[in-house]
Amino acid sequence: MSEPGQPEWWFYHLKRTTLEQAAGPLLEKCLERGWRVLAVSPDIRRRGALDAALWTYNDQSFLPHGQAEAAGLDASKQPVLITEAPENVNKAAVALLMDGADMPIHAEFERCMVMFDDGDAPVRGKARSLYKAASDAGLT
């Protein structure tokens, strides 16, 4: 387990699967560990696609989650909160960063996971910059 302000940074370079397909198993593992997740994307389409994918991820189980934009949602109670804003309102241990979402290297999470598609050159470049910064700080 990492210290506050010293999260472990993990990077997922997606080449053969979509982010929505890859996110389900990762989120399931986080929840099995008792971790809450803040899933951050600046792209409203991605947030909607992830929400839809999590509803149908596994026929045998349900991944509890909510979108911060949903009317009447108590964001603080969501085990997985899908949001545009990087504010940790659900007291998550893990930040899942998508589509070039920003997060300080010394964020107050136990783990920061960056998922990026190989075909998206700008996002891939940003992920490389984050990797270098996290690596230089000894957080990878």
Show which residues each predicted segment covers.
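Structural motif
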Residues: 15, 41-44, 97-101, 117-118
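Active-site-adjacent structural patch at catalytic or cofactor/ligand-binding sites
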Residues: 78-115
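Long, hydrophobic N-terminal alpha-helical segment
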Residues: 1-47
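Short, charged/polar "capping" segments at the starts of alpha-helices
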Residues: 45-49, 122-123
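Short, solvent-exposed amphipathic alpha-helical segments in soluble enzyme
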Residues: 26-29, 54-58, 112-113, 129-133
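Glycine-rich, aromatic-bearing surface loops/beta-hairpins
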Residues: 111-140
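Terminal and domain-boundary regions
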Residues: 5, 33-36, 50-59, 63, ...
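Helix-adjacent hinge/juxtasegments
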Residues: 52-92
